[in-house]
């Protein structure tokens, strides 16, 4: 089940999963992983629950802007390769569309190894630039949802 994380308990579970994936597995510094956008009123945190366990998270930021961003997409290691990420991204798109009630332009900063995954969901590169974020190669991608 995909839902918006609202309670402090749910948000803390989401932050813990992100810390596990990004900080522990990918060695991203904690001060880069958790940031001020996590507590912005224009951020929506999304969770994927399986048997009441949070196994996937993402966040929608800049919900007050013309272009919103999906980021901090993390899936528990034990559940990767099972289509959870695909369902989570589609869920994020649906939630964004439901909240904003208009055409939605979504941009994201994809880790280079996830580019094919996002391409399969209809995202395209914005440019040819590959850049480092937290010492991991990324590319900018975009999708318009009518």
What function would you assign to each model-found segment?
Residues 1-33, 38, 49-53:
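Short amphipathic alpha-helix that is part of the acyltransferase structural core
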Residues 35-40, 131-133:
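A short beta-turn/loop motif at secondary-structure boundaries
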Residues 47, 53-62, 66-74:
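Conserved beta-strand in the GNAT
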Residues 62-70, 80, 100-104, 132-137:
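A conserved beta-turn-beta hairpin within the catalytic core of GNAT-like acetyltransferases
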Residues 75, 81-94:
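Conserved acetyl-CoA-binding loop-helix of GNAT-fold acetyltransferases
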Residues 78-80, 102, 109, 113-117:
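Acidic/histidine-enriched, beta-strand-rich ligand/metal-binding domains
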Residues 89, 96-110:
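Conserved GNAT acetyl-CoA-binding A-motif
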Residues 107, 119, 124-140:
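Conserved catalytic-core motifs of GNAT/GCN5-like acyltransferases
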């Amino acid at each position: 089940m995909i839902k918006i994380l609202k309670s402090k308990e749910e948000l803390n579970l989401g932050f813990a999963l992100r810390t596990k994936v990004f900080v522990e597995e990918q060695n991203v510094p904690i001060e880069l992983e958790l940031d001020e956008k996590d507590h912005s009123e224009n951020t929506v945190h999304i969770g994927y629950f399986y048997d009441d366990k949070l196994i996937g998270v993402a966040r929608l930021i800049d919900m007050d802007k013309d272009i919103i961003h999906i980021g901090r997409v993390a899936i528990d290691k034990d559940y990767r390769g099972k289509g959870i990420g695909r369902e989570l991204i589609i869920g994020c798109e649906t939630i964004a569309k439901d909240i904003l009630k208009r055409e939605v332009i979504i941009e994201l900063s994809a880790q280079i190894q996830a580019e094919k995954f996002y391409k399969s969901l209809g995202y395209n590169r914005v440019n040819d630039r590959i850049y480092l974020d937290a010492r991991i190669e990324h590319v900018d991608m975009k999708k318009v949802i009518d």
